[in-house]
Regions:
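Positively charged n-region of N-terminal signal peptides that target proteins for export
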Residues: 1-4, 396
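Generic hydrophobic-segment detector
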Residues: 5-7, 139, 334, 370
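Kelch-like beta-propeller repeat domains
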Residues: 9, 17-317
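Generic secondary-structure boundary signal with a strong preference for alpha-helix termini
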Residues: 14, 105, 368-369
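C-terminal outer-membrane/trafficking sorting elements
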Residues: 323-396
């Protein structure tokens, strides 16, 4: 069955998709298929660094993504060792990457404690104070978040059977680490985290060999943790991000691979299923946010490592004026297998767009009721955009 999805409402066979809650496939990551990388965003650009490629070789390369051109460009390699399962974040226009393991084979690997700052203005790296946690032995499989101009690293592993529940705070202004209150969920690795209102939300992961679903919020001001509503299911190695004061957990593993997206609302302490990831199920993928849109990709799926990237449009991305115009365009039936009806009022053009953003068909000065034939198109998800000639995009 072909599925037509119009831009401001979406129906998918793979998940729950509602108003302004959908995914679009982007160009593949040109750094090659990989997993266990780190990512961060600076200004209007996204960055992916390190990881493990299809030859099972750890990496130290850095790539930058421009959403305006949907393209990638390689930048200066991370100095020091190649690494996997490191941490990354950005603060005040500077990217930070560190820790991890220097080899794919655990028995031949050394946990790393070095920490580096990337300046995009001159494409340069500078070494910063080493991570001092767990006696300075290094850490990998931990999670990181930022709050109030500081970075935080929580949990992880520092040996084959050595796990951490420590929380460390990094202050860029003085290049200094300080230990804070331990994570209350016990020792943990493969955790997930995101930031809302200058508070860190941390949970999930693996307690030695048991997948967990508990979640906690950390208040840097009081240096205290509080437990919040459990995540719906246990998992580790998920991707996470926050947009519009909402937190998101995507993908991961609970033994099998997962492809769902779950949103957390701190106002009501509740998790809600959102539109499932439009790519294949995977774990150890990366995520970053640009202009209130999330980009999630790479990772490892059932068929191996991935280079595909997908963009998520959350709810609340439309303004009041945009929302007031929704009633002027109706699309039905949806799903459809051949013909879709587009009833449009006061619009100068409508466009049919595929999931990669390619314009399939444009209709200028449309009739109030246009019938669009989809019978020759491959099955999938499509979008309708309504436009007027004053350059005002009614839906985006």
């Amino acid at each position: 069955m072909r599925i037509l999805v119009f831009l401001f409402s979406m129906i998918s066979l793979n998940g729950i998709c509602q108003f302004s809650n959908y995914w679009i496939e982007k160009n593949d990551f040109t750094g090659g298929k990989r997993e266990r990388s780190v990512a961060f965003s600076i200004e209007n650009l996204g960055y992916i660094c390190s990881g493990v490629n299809t030859s099972e070789v750890s990496l130290n390369d850095l790539w930058v993504y421009n959403p305006n051109t949907d393209s990638w460009e390689q930048k200066a390699n991370l100095p020091g060792s190649v690494r996997r399962n490191a941490i990354g974040f950005s603060i005040n226009g500077i990217g930070y990457v560190g820790m991890g393991m220097d080899s794919v084979i655990a028995s031949e690997s050394i946990p790393l404690n070095d920490f580096w700052a990337y300046n995009p203005l001159d494409n340069s790296w500078e070494q910063k104070a080493n991570y001092p946690g767990n006696g300075g032995t290094g850490i990998y499989f931990s999670t990181a978040f930022t709050a109030d101009g500081k970075g935080y690293v929580c949990g992880g592993k520092f040996g084959a059977n050595s796990y951490s529940n420590e929380l460390w705070e990094y202050k860029p202004s003085i290049d200094q680490w300080s230990q804070r209150t331990n994570f209350p969920g016990g020792v943990r690795y493969q955790l997930s985290s995101f930031t809302i209102d200058n508070k860190g939300y941390v949970g999930l992961g693996v307690n030695q060999d048991v997948y967990k679903k508990d979640f906690y919020v950390y208040n840097p001001g009081s240096n205290q943790w509080s437990q919040i509503q459990d995540f719906p299911t246990e998992r580790g190695s998920a991707s996470s991000f926050s947009i519009f004061n909402r937190g998101y957990i995507c993908l991961g593993t609970n033994g099998g691979l997962l492809g769902d997206l779950i949103e957390y609302n701190p106002e009501i302490n509740q998790w809600t299923a959102k539109c499932s990831y439009s790519g294949s199920e995977r774990k150890c993928a990366v995520s970053f946010v640009i202009n209130n849109r999330a980009y999630v990709g790479t990772g490892k799926g059932y068929s191996g490592k991935k280079d595909s990237m997908h963009e998520y449009f959350p709810e609340n991305t439309l303004g009041v004026q945009d929302i007031s115009n929704l009633s002027q365009t109706l699309i039905y039936p949806n799903p459809t297998s051949d013909i879709v009806n587009v009833r449009s009022y006061n619009n100068d053009a409508i466009q049919l767009i595929d999931s990669r953003g390619n314009i399939i068909q444009s209709i200028f000065n449309p009739e109030k009721l246009e019938k669009i034939d989809l019978s020759m198109l491959p099955k999938g998800i499509y979008f309708i955009k309504s436009i007027d000639f004053e350059e005002k995009i009614i839906l985006e």
